[in-house]
From Swiss-Prot:
<comment type="subunit">
    <text>Component of the 25S U4/U6.U5 tri-snRNP particle, a subcomplex of the spliceosome.</text>
</comment>
<comment type="function">
    <text>Component of the spliceosome and rRNA processing machinery. In association with the spliceosomal U4/U6.U5 tri-snRNP particle, required for splicing of pre-mRNA.</text>
</comment>
<feature type="region of interest" description="Disordered">
    <location>
        <begin position="1"/>
        <end position="109"/>
    </location>
</feature>
<comment type="similarity">
    <text>Belongs to the SPP381 family.</text>
</comment>
<keyword id="KW-0747">Spliceosome</keyword>
<protein>
    <recommendedName>
        <fullName>Pre-mRNA-splicing factor SPP381</fullName>
    </recommendedName>
</protein>
<dbReference type="GO" id="GO:0008380">
    <property type="term" value="P:RNA splicing"/>
</dbReference>
<dbReference type="GO" id="GO:0005681">
    <property type="term" value="C:spliceosomal complex"/>
</dbReference>
<keyword id="KW-0687">Ribonucleoprotein</keyword>
<dbReference type="GO" id="GO:0003723">
    <property type="term" value="F:RNA binding"/>
</dbReference>
<keyword id="KW-0507">mRNA processing</keyword>
<keyword id="KW-0539">Nucleus</keyword>
<feature type="region of interest" description="Disordered">
    <location>
        <begin position="178"/>
        <end position="264"/>
    </location>
</feature>
<keyword id="KW-0508">mRNA splicing</keyword>
<dbReference type="GO" id="GO:0006397">
    <property type="term" value="P:mRNA processing"/>
</dbReference>
<keyword id="KW-0694">RNA-binding</keyword>
<feature type="compositionally biased region" description="Basic and acidic residues">
    <location>
        <begin position="178"/>
        <end position="188"/>
    </location>
</feature>
Length: 264
């Protein structure tokens, strides 16, 4: 690059000198055969000579600069080239406005809500499993205690056996007493029923007194029989006086002892 600059500058200097010589020739031709060079010509010649004198120094300086540039370029080429990682920028959507931002916010809220629900469901399941494990261990412990009690019951002491025997005897006596009471009550009911049937089978006279034999029927006055015949069918609807022996035989016994409090 420095070499090109130097060549371009040298061509400019040579072109400038050639143009000066041409102008000088033209001026000489115009003036004709003058006595000597004019002041302008002398100045042009001095400038040309100064340019030729400065050209080697400029060329040397430019050559030195070109050498330095070549050395720097060669040293830079020798160094390792560092390539940076490219950064890609997202292209903004011009149509994304407040509605898009609102949708993004709502989507984030829904995702957060789903995560919370999932976390709560996991906690509920763990709690249920813990309760099941606790109840299972409690049931096992309860069954173990029951089995231990049954095992302890097989090895009763002598006092406990004696107490159980006494309780069994009391229960047997109580059952016998209740059975005897039931038998006695049943026999009384049967006797009362038999007496009632016997009293209902005996004939009644006109006065309403039951007679046991024919002797009593023979001593009955005739006037009463005649009066009964005269009364006709209305006589059977006439109420009669209740006698004490009849009431005593037909009355049923008290049933207060048949309830659940009679055994106590």
């Amino acid at each position: 690059m420095a070499i090109r600059h130097f060549r371009r500058q040298r061509e400019q200097v040579t072109s400038g000198s050639s143009s000066d010589t041409e102008t000088s020739d033209v001026s000489e031709q115009d003036t004709g055969a003058g006595e000597g060079p004019t002041e302008a010509e002398t100045r042009a010649e001095g400038a040309e000579q100064g340019a030729w004198e400065r050209a080697p120094s400029v060329a040397g300086s430019e050559a030195g600069e070109s050498d330095e540039d070549d050395s720097e370029s060669s040293s830079s080429d020798d160094e390792e080239v560092v390539l940076h990682r490219p950064v890609f920028l997202k292209k903004r959507d011009p149509g994304a406005g407040p509605a898009a931002r609102t949708g993004a916010v709502s989507g984030a809220q829904e995702r957060t809500l789903d995560q919370v629900q999932h976390h709560n469901a996991v906690q509920d399941k763990e709690r249920a499993l813990k309760q099941i494990a606790t109840s299972y261990s409690t049931d096992k412990e309860l069954l173990h205690r029951i089995a231990q009690l049954e095992t302890d019951g097989d090895t009763d002491s002598d006092s406990e056996r004696r107490e159980h025997e006494l309780w069994a005897q009391r229960r047997h006596q109580r059952m016998l007493r209740l059975r005897e009471e039931e038998r006695r009550r049943q026999s009384e009911l049967e006797e009362n029923e038999a007496a009632r049937l016997t009293n209902s089978a005996l004939p009644m006279d006109d006065a309403g007194i039951q007679t046991a034999g024919g002797a009593e029927r023979g001593t009955r006055p005739a006037s009463s029989s005649d009066a009964r015949k005269r009364r006709g069918p209305e006589a059977k609807f006439k109420p009669s006086k209740v006698q004490k022996p009849q009431l005593k035989r037909t009355a049923s016994p008290s049933r207060a002892d048949e309830n659940e409090f009679s055994i106590l």
